[in-house]
Amino acid sequence: MSDFDSSNFDFFKYKPDYAKIAEAAFSRLSFTFTKEHLENVIKAALAPDASENDKYVCSCILKNAEVAAKGKFPLCQDTGIANIFGWNNGSIIPEDISNQLTKGTAKIYDEKKLRFSTSCPSSFYEEFDPKNNMPAQISIFTNGAALAPTPSFAEKAPKGSLSLLFCAKGGGSSNKTSFIQGTKAFLTKERFTNLIKEQLGKFGTSACPPYTIAIVAGGLSPEQNLLTLKLATMGAYSDMTHTPNKDVFRDSELEEIAMQIARDSGYGAQFGGSRFALETVVIRLPRHGASCPISFGVSCSAHRNLRAVVTNNGFYLEKTVSNPAELEGFSEATRPANEKSEKSGGNELHLNTENGIAALLASLKAAKPGDRVLLSGKILVARDAAHARWQKLIDAGNKLPEYTTKYPICYAGPARTPEGEVIGSFGPTTAGRMDVYAESLMSRGAALITLAKGNRSQPWTDACAKYGAVYLGTPGGIAALIANEYIRGQEIIDYEDLGMEAVRLVDVENLPCFVITDSLGNDFYKQIAEKSKK
């Protein structure tokens, strides 16, 4: 046989059908996590040095997993670009394997009401929604001729098999990838440690920590370095040796250093604390003497990766947890979110949008950056494409739609609505992408209260101080929970052709938020960054 350990896999016995394999993989990973990932989140929630906000966010992430595991609401509203990597160990694979994998993937995105996130070009500047989330990113390698190091599970797979790694990669975490075409000068402990501090500080919170952080130094080419990074964020190298050698290894000391830097950053699990990372992976590769590629990347808290091994007799698919509540520590770890439910009262500021923006802003004057708010009432939901259209109206000398000034604006694009439900999985998108519109909108009375995730730029913060605006951060990574517990209704009111980016009015009840930027321009994340430097 081989060294392949099948104990963590389910086996499906029938002739290999790559469309069905893709269906099974993306159906499983879109709604359930592996036991290892859930245990890491539980550990973070129960860590002695976790802040109250760390505990609360991790608690919500775990409750989100419990809701999603029922199979109706996907784990995240951004159900991601479908990534499939394969390593062939002597298997005879069909010529149309990419077409088969694509067919199965597209079927699940359609049938499971997963979000269609891809934009395809109709010209260099114009785009359209293909309404199937395709194309998928598919790369199949021969074990001995892979661009990046072959994962150990693929190396140990039976002869005549094909190993596959499936991933749903969201835009927020992909956008955190950074690449430096460095030199040997970076390869000292002091210089590399300083580089880690610099790059981890740039991650911020908009990709939904706690993160799996990967760092890769070396590589015979930029593309080898970056593919190794991508696979590292997917957990492909969990069994890689930590013993230095000429080919590839993980560095234990730098992983500990990176984890400590993550703790000390102060960002925590989104709203201040120590749980910025669940795991760090630092990999060293060979390099050309004249260059040293270095890359940094993350996988978000919606860590959706799944392994499969296909043989002539059937296929093995990595197990996930169908009932997270049965895991040891789950009940204790989810207590903070349960205790801070709407029934508990608590110290949160309760606000309702029915009295208008001016009344909301007046109420928010009592809140400090970092304070928690429970928001009820109607909010406007709009993101990149809608903002671009509003800007076109302004540029053409036209007025903004009246709705832009009547409600708080939440940047989000929900997953498609499951049958019998009010809305699909719903969570915030990255705030910073809309910062360019600060002056255009606020000067016209719009975007005076916004909801999103992550840190914002100085121009946005300055605009908040100038116009008395407030930015509220909504927890990321809990989209199934938000759709299931905090949303009462929705309607599309404009730009229906934009699909998931259409403008909506969404009715929320006790939606949890945190004050990030107040009306004086005080910024929560800037305060954290300044504190971490002391």
Q: Where on the chain are the PLM-derived regions?
A:
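Non-transmembrane, aqueous-exposed alpha-helical and coiled segments at domain scale
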Residues: 1-215, 220-345, 424, 442
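Short acidic/polar capping segments at secondary-structure boundaries
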Residues: 144-145, 169-173, 219-220, 455-457, ...
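Short, solvent-exposed amphipathic alpha-helical segments in soluble enzyme
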Residues: 182, 228-232, 295-299, 312-314, ...
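Feature captures the catalytic cores and cofactor-binding loops of soluble hydro-lyases/lyases
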Residues: 236-262, 266, 270, 381-511
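C-terminal binding/interaction regions
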Residues: 273-280, 287-288, 484-534
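Short, structured beta-strand/loop micro-motifs enriched in basic residues and often containing a Trp
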Residues: 347-359
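Short, well-ordered loop/turn sites that connect or cap secondary structure elements
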Residues: 364-367, 373
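Generic structural signal for buried aliphatic residues
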Residues: 373-375, 379
